[in-house]
Amino acid sequence: MFRNAEEKDFALYMELAQEFYHSPAVMHPIPTQYMENTFREAMRSDVYIILRILEVDGEAAGYAILSRSFSPESGSPICWIEELYIREAYRGHGLGTKFFSSVRKEFPTARLRLEVEPENTGAVALYKRLGFTPLEYVSYVVEPDGADA
């Protein structure tokens, strides 16, 4: 049901990522080049990023991107759920719950973190049901010179 992406999945990943980044779940789309960079990095190594394809009965139901780091704040590894996209036809059937269960089994000592648009009420409800709680942080970012903001 959840498998690591392979080189042959490039077109599928690009299709799914385009769907995700043109959905109400995100604040704004990202350049296609960023998606391509993400796929290339996931194929190069799983040190920073893991790209999973979610399948139901052999059909692509979505994808997820995980990244790993260590947090001094929690004194433990962190597994960021960078992106989780489940196609509309597959929502509400427990796929998200099963995905998080598989992540928890794979990274049992890691703190799980994610970000969500408050308007994405279905995702917010899932995350709360799974025990996620909001952090009272404001995130800031600065892009490298020449990068799109």
Label every PLM stretch briefly.
Residues A5, L84-I86, V116:
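Hydrophobic adenine-recognition pocket in adenosine-nucleotide-binding enzymes
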Residues R91, V103, P108, R113-V124, ...:
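Conserved beta-strand-loop-alpha-helix junction that forms the acyl-donor binding cleft
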